[in-house]
Amino acid sequence: LKRTHYCTQVTTADIGKEVVVGGFTAKQRDKGELVFIDLRDRTGIIQLIFDDSTDRAVMQKAKEVRSEYVLMAKGTVRRRESINPDIPTGEIEIFVTELRILAKAQTPPFHITDETDTNEELRLRYRYLDLRRKQLQDNLMKRARITKVTRDFFADNGFIEIDTPMMIKSTPEGARDYVVPSRIHKGSFYALPQSPQI
């Protein structure tokens, strides 16, 4: 399966069309003959639906899905029976005909939501999970846009960007250094700097 849309790119204009979306499972609700999955990607959330007309194997997969599983889903866009005005895709849902579980996940140590009361130490320990929160993703996207605008400005004004390695004295703490031998001072070594890991 190859993604055709990000979650919030699917709109009411796509009703009746077949789409492929992918992302993380924000929530799974099993109501017996009905299964709902809120699929989250970097743009937002869309609801996937499975009912008694869904292929048995696909329905079984949907029932196995847990929080933060990575999924790809193919299906037909249709209007939701109960509209959710709180999200951009609240008027639509995807009736899934094909579901792939790309990666399973253990139960996360905290809920990945914008409003979290999780202590900072736990969030930093699981930074890769914390970065899935919309607030932090928005910060990363803003930073990327600012960096691009800055680079474009300097490039348009004749500047050349040059990335050079910076040699520093090796430090005993932290991660393993990438050691570079000195050509001038035989037997001496430099280390490439370590980037902060937060």
Language model region names:
Residues K2-I198:
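Class II aminoacyl-tRNA synthetase-like tRNA-binding/catalytic domains
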